[in-house]
Amino acid sequence: LSLTNGNFDIVEVGDYISMPSRTGSMLSLSGCKKIVFNDVRVYASGGMCCVASGGEGGHEFHHFIATRRPGTNRLYAFGADGFHMNELANGPVIEDSEMSYTADDLINIHGRFGWVCSRNNNSKTHLRILCSAGAIKVGQEIDFWDNVTQQYRGKATVESLTRVSNATEIAEAKKDVIQYLDGSIYDIVLSNEVEADKASLIEHHANVCSGFVVRNCKLHDTFNRGFLINGASDGIIENNIVQNVGSGQSFHMETWIYGEGQYINNLIVRNNTFKKAGALWFSTVPPGGNSF
């Protein structure tokens, strides 16, 4: 428990505190497709309430109630995020549901950046990269960004793609990758030169939970964010109530240790009510970068 000059005066003898110990998720979907949940009630989990990662996605949650058990006074019912959806080809539909008393974000929906590990023979068209499986395919157009300045480094089409299988080469390629960014290592050949150096970010526009919907939900009581949306495209957030949260919403990308992305586009947010909510954050990257 850290006490500083900034918070010492609000802590008193007899205060009720909770220190969650994060363990496994209550519900975990990995590589699944179109799983539908109706009329589910959850009162506690040592980790995330519901996590879905990888695969086709398109999962649906209808009248999914996750809150502390009635009659209890728990500050936390869940040890991490509530809904955590990542790297799905199709985003989730969450309707008429409730999420509350989490030890992290109530709803977190995101993709994942790719990462340039090195230039092969210092080439600007032949790169060794890290990327989640299936996110980059031959014929796909991808963008490159500087990890620190967010300056745009170019666009190219993938002409060939070869997965690296040598364990020593894989370990060397991953040596300087940011902490929570993981995936397979590939050698790619691009249609044209790009100014992408080692540690550049790759925006591959795939497996970013596109088309997600959060509608008619009640999200409340967390020290952290009601919504954290990192790069999920073509989403709709409407007719929700967000109350008693540290931050109402945060729409951006994360380039630090988590590498959650990529950049948001075509997001509709309408008819939502925020009560006793902190800042509503939007991060954008102007043409040419330099967002910081």
Per-region residue spans from a language model:
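Extracellular parallel beta-helix/beta-solenoid repeat domains
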Residues: L1-F292
